[in-house]
From Swiss-Prot:
The keyword Cell wall biogenesis/degradation applies. SUPFAM superfamilies: UDP-Glycosyltransferase/glycogen phosphorylase. It comes from Shigella flexneri serotype 5b (strain 8401). Belongs to the glycosyltransferase 28 family. MurG subfamily. UDP-N-acetyl-alpha-D-glucosamine binds at residues 15-17, 127, 163, 191, 244, 263-268, 288. This is UDP-N-acetylglucosamine--N-acetylmuramyl-(pentapeptide) pyrophosphoryl-undecaprenol N-acetylglucosamine transferase. The gene is murG. It catalyses: di-trans,octa-cis-undecaprenyl diphospho-N-acetyl-alpha-D-muramoyl-L-alanyl-D-glutamyl-meso-2,6-diaminopimeloyl-D-alanyl-D-alanine + UDP-N-acetyl-alpha-D-glucosamine = di-trans,octa-cis-undecaprenyl diphospho-[N-acetyl-alpha-D-glucosaminyl-(1->4)]-N-acetyl-alpha-D-muramoyl-L-alanyl-D-glutamyl-meso-2,6-diaminopimeloyl-D-alanyl-D-alanine + UDP + H(+).
Amino acid sequence: MSGQGKRLMVMAGGTGGHVFPGLAVAHYLMAQGWQVRWLGTADRMEADLVPKHGIEIDFIRISGLRGKGIKALIAAPLRIFNAWRQARAIMKAYKPDVVLGMGGYVSGPGGLAAWSLGIPVVLHEQNGIAGLTNKWLAKIATKVMQAFPGAFPNAEVVGNPVRTDVLALPLPQQRLAGREGPVRVLVVGGSQGARILNQTMPQVAAKLGDSVTIWHQSGKGSQQSVEQAYAEAGQPQHKVTEFIDDMAAAYAWADVVVCRSGALTVSEIAAAGLPALFVPFQHKDRQQYWNALPLEKAGAAKIIEQPQLSVDAVANTLAGWSRETLLTMAERARAASIPDATERVANEVSRAARA
């Protein structure tokens, strides 16, 4: 699939859940000879992250409309129009053959600008319930893809592009068979941590005693307080780190994960082939619940929603999973994953550019 001379503009911003899958597709297509530029906003994570990956980035001024008050809503049409004009000028100069919208506020004006210039718009929805921007853009898109079934009624399910180091992990049977000793529990609340897990897991550790060993990612600024909580619970032996740079190594170490269920986390856990206890973030549209549901239905995970979360609920769940059960769940997780998601998205981008 040679893309010699073809030009792609990726539109993604705000959070890692939008940006990292976009980077995976960008690198895949760059290896095929494509030129790639990025459309983002100057005050979000993409501004620093994308240039580190050798990709030039253009900025437009746009932010979210949710919960901003009446003045912001009145000003919204003008802000969107100005952002559309900025995006249109950028695209007229760059002349992409196709644009790929991965979500975030930047995709809205960017997608409209591409459509107004006759440039094919390809969309990828990472979450189990569609975001507002992608709902709007789906009406004008050349192709709509989704990571999990249910975000769009008729869109192709292609999974989420995940990092190659996670995809390269040995399969569960090779990795987990023959493991003995305490069950290795990886606790991850996302890069920001999750206060509810930071508060709950030290007490869970006290209940489970030496049947588990825990590696707990606390999130920025929380390492000391979480270490103290484990010590006060009589469990100082467990490892607490603020951030985990090498998630593939953490997944390779773990027997089971206790975590939030952001789209990328769920897809990585499936690709790694790991059982999980998901505690979805309480978003009003239950986005993280819908992300986790396919793995629970596959018998690879359990969901405990935050109102039902307790020390006993977590401790009893983990205590009830034997090593044999964990291996079966791990194999089901891997079977439910879509390891070639990056290639699938890239192929649709190529197809749209040729159309």
